[in-house]
């Protein structure tokens, strides 16, 4: 299986004995929107006759699936014998390679929020909010889940070795959050991509619908795809963001990464919030990554530094919405952080107190997807060559 630009999976079933063989599929799977409209992407669509891409199974990613007698394998994408330029996983690989060229290995951990919806013939699409009378934030038992899905998802994730740290109820009834174990960037993104598919399919088997939309209901808070990020030296070593004795315990490398994220805040939005609905979440007042600022254990800032230090020192990027493609959201984050290092940027002072009542900046994410696309034209989407 592989990811399209929307973060949706494509693939095929093959017998295990043929796992090492490359597949061939129309490259248009990468040039479709969620309504299956083929987009006029030069070099990949009608202008070149809808040619094939090649799928290259990565046997090292093989893991037990959630369907009977079925394993899951991630595939890399090639086009004319070269890595497919518009492939989301390839975009993340380029970002990882750029950091490795500087001697650092990016480490990521994903927090994935979503809503479980129940059948409702009167609701749009036939599904509406899940009814949990005793719901409470971070609730357990019937205070967080009346469907049994939490245990089903956790059990399947354990079998698939997706390395979940935990699952819990979130702010509104039916909203849940999965926390995934920290790891090397590509492995972490692979696991997040697979986990999205697994959760949706297992819910469907029980008659429910899981949605990762940024904000499916205006009366409820949105769902995010928070990405935790740090660096370690290539070949092993201690967390390069941690520096005992430095201001806030953060190294100059960490401050420059924060500086890059803040400098390119508006340009990050289009890959972090890739749908029209995403911008119903990115508004002030619901601690969702709106302002171009950072803070010390402050959820009203977009780039939060949790209180832990040492090996756990990290930047939590709170902008990406649940519908973001894990590969692309991670790639643009790593690229923006790298530009902060290349350009020697500093992050300035952290946001203090309530960042919505008294933000320390007037810069924020765009209000519409079209504005986000325009912002991307005025920021550097990838590390400079010079």
PLM regions: where:
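ATP/Mg2+-dependent ligation/transfer catalytic cores
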Residues: 1-166, 188, 208, 361-380, ...
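A generic structural motif
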Residues: 4, 78-84, 142, 182-188, ...
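Short glycine/proline-enriched loop/turn "hinge" motifs that connect secondary-structure elements
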Residues: 62-69, 105-107, 167-172, 220, ...
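Short, hydrophobic beta-strand segments
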Residues: 73-79, 176-182, 229
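Short, conserved phosphate-binding/catalytic loop or strand-edge motifs used
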Residues: 112-116, 170-178
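Active-site-proximal beta-alpha loop/turn segments in soluble metabolic enzymes
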Residues: 130-140, 173-187, 217-222, 238-241
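Loop-centered beta-sheet repeat module
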Residues: 189-196, 205-212, 227
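Catalytic-core signal marking the mid-to-C-terminal active-site face
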Residues: 194, 201-204, 208-209, 232-289, ...
């Amino acid at each position: 299986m592989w990811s399209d630009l929307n973060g949706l999976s494509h693939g095929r079933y093959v017998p295990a004995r043929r796992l090492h063989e490359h597949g061939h599929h129309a490259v248009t799977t990468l040039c479709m929107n969620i309504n299956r409209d083929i987009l006029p992407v030069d070099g990949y669509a009608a202008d070149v006759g809808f040619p094939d891409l090649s799928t290259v199974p990565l046997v090292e990613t093989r893991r037990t699936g959630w369907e009977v007698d079925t394993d899951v394998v991630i595939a890399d994408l090639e086009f004319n014998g070269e890595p497919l330029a518009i492939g989301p996983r390839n975009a993340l690989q380029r970002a990882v390679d750029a950091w490795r060229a500087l001697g650092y290995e990016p480490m990521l951990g994903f927090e994935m929020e979503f809503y479980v919806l129940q059948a409702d013939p009167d609701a749009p699409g036939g599904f509406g909010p899940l009814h949990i009378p005793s719901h409470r934030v971070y609730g357990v038992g019937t205070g967080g889940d009346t469907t049994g899905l939490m245990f089903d998802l956790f059990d399947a994730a354990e079998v698939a070795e997706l390395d979940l740290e935990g699952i819990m109820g979130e702010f509104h009834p039916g909203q849940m959050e999965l926390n995934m174990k920290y790891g090397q960037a590509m492995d972490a993104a692979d696991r997040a991509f697979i986990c999205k598919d697994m959760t949706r399919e297992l819910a469907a088997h029980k008659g429910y619908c899981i949605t990762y939309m940024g904000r499916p209901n205006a009366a409820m808070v949105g769902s995010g795809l928070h990405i935790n990020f740090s660096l370690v030296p290539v070949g092993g070593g201690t967390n390069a963001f941690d520096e005992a004795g430095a201001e806030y315990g953060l190294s100059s490398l960490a401050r420059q990464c924060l500086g890059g994220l803040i400098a390119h805040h508006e340009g990050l939005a289009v890959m972090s919030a890739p749908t029209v609905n995403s911008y119903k979440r990115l508004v002030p007042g619901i601690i969702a990554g709106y302002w171009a600022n950072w803070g010390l254990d402050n959820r009203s800032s977009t780039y939060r530094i949790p209180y832990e230090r040492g090996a756990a020192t990290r930047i939590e990027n709170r902008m990406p919405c649940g519908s973001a493609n894990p590969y692309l959201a991670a790639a643009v984050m790593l690229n923006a952080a790298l530009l902060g290092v290349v350009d020697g940027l500093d992050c300035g002072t952290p946001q203090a107190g309530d960042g919505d009542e008294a933000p320390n900046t007037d810069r924020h994410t765009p209000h519409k997807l079209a504005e986000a696309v325009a912002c991307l034209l005025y920021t550097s989407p990838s590390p400079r060559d010079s």
